[in-house]
């Protein structure tokens, strides 16, 4: 198991104007951790989607909501937890309501709803959802995933 080096916590009001603050802080943290430009862009999109989902769905425009964003930096990965204490939902029920997405489907013809979680799952290496008091989305991205694959190929037995 990888050792955690640092944990950074950010408390955001559940308002659209603060989504960019989560994205900007992530960019600096991921850059310092050694992620490539492409991986940082993927991380920024995924975290923006997770925070936006909390703003739009957990609090439904209420002024007093708060979102917690935790960045856990390990030697080989970055784990980002976006948590709220707003209205929860059941992912499996939601997936059944909207049906599966076809990656070959024309983007203009895609139905609205559920695309944020689809994007998060596509861009991140691992995604877990927890339903306690609200929803927590835990997203993991490994550092130098291509390098890890190359090293595995070069190991001889």
From Swiss-Prot:
One of its GO terms (molecular function) is protein serine/threonine kinase activity. It catalyses: L-seryl-[protein] + ATP = O-phospho-L-seryl-[protein] + ADP + H(+); L-threonyl-[protein] + ATP = O-phospho-L-threonyl-[protein] + ADP + H(+). Belongs to the anti-sigma-factor family. The keyword ATP-binding applies. Negative regulator of sigma-B activity. Phosphorylates and inactivates its specific antagonist protein, RsbV. Upon phosphorylation of RsbV, RsbW is released and binds to sigma-B, thereby blocking its ability to form an RNA polymerase holoenzyme (E-sigma-B). It is an enzyme of class 2 (transferase). InterPro entries: Anti-sigma-factor_SerPK, HATPase_C_sf, RsbW. CDD domains: HATPase_RsbW-like. This is Serine-protein kinase RsbW. GO terms for biological process: negative regulation of DNA-templated transcription.
